[in-house]
């Protein structure tokens, strides 16, 4: 099992008893959260429970702003139930060069705000600010902002903000071919809405057991995306169905049971994101729980 501490970035107040039960460490974005968590701790006779205090340096989603620091300092000094294990912030645009000045402003503000709080409490929490983009684009040039830790998020999956060649994918979405049909030019069409055209020479079609209920966006239909089969990229044909979709494997040596890569090293999650005008985060998080996860190589 996992032996290292687990930071819960956003734990709802109703989850606090479970957080304590499983020795998790919650993020604290405001005094109200600290007060509620402190009450739960006090009712259980617990002191110095580790929490992680979030600072809002420009994302404006969660966290303490500068005008709230006096209340934060007072709380940390007055409530022995909690002990700040770390201070952290989140960068809003570290992936985009156009926002580099803003990102550096966030880091500078975080430095100043946390130094203010550090000077007012009798212990020294760790600090962390870099996300995956921050690590890749700022860590080497601005080592002073590496602090004590960094939060590697989507980088764990091998996604790069500079060049995909810098990273090796660690997450693959794969499935088997479940049926193959060789269709002639007079065999009609493929899929719902009859959008899959066979052309004058016909096509060889492979059906795979994933559809839009499995995170395969319908905008990847009708050849918009291609999936890898035995080293070849095979375009979708017709509309993506709920639980299945079809790909064109004409001229490719393939059989039922062969593996199809939806995303991984080719195509990458970035490739699919570009087709859908979105980000790779959405590609990964769109894969629902019903899709089996297999962990290997540990």
Features from the language model and the residues they span:
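Active-site anion/phosphate-binding pocket segments in diverse small-molecule metabolic enzymes
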Residues: 12-14, 18, 30-35, 104-298
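Active-site-proximal beta-alpha core segment in soluble small-molecule metabolic enzymes
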Residues: 1-126, 142
């Amino acid at each position: 099992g996992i032996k290292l501490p687990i930071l819960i970035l956003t734990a709802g107040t109703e989850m606090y008893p479970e957080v304590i039960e499983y020795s998790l460490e919650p993020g604290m974005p405001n005094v109200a959260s600290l007060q509620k968590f402190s009450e739960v701790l006090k009712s259980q006779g617990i002191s110095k429970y580790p929490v992680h205090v979030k600072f809002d340096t420009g994302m404006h989603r969660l966290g303490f702003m500068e005008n709230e620091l006096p209340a934060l300092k007072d709380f940390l000094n007055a409530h022995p139930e909690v002990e700040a294990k770390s201070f952290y912030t989140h960068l809003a645009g570290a992936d985009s060069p156009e926002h580099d000045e803003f990102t550096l402003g966030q880091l500078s503000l975080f430095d100043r705000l946390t130094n203010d709080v550090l000077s007012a409490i009798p212990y020294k929490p760790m600090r962390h600010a870099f996300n995956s983009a921050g690590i890749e684009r700022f860590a080497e040039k601005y080592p002073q902002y590496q602090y004590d830790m960094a939060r590697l998020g989507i980088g764990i999956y091998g996604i790069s903000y500079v060049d995909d060649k810098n990273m090796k994918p660690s997450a693959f979405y794969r499935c088997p071919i479940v049926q193959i049909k060789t269709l002639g030019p007079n065999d009609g069409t493929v899929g719902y809405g009859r959008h899959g055209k066979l052309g004058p020479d016909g096509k060889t079609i492979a059906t795979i057991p994933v559809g839009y209920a499995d995170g395969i966006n319908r905008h990847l239909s009708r050849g918009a995306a291609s999936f890898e089969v035995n080293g070849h990229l095979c375009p979708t044909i017709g509309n993506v169905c709920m639980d299945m979709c079809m790909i064109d494997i004409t001229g490719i040596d393939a059989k039922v049971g062969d593996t199809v890569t939806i995303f991984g090293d080719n195509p990458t999650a970035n490739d699919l994101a570009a087709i859908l005008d979105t980000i790779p985060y959405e590609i990964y998080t769109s894969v629902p729980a019903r899709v089996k996860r297999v962990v290997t190589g540990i």
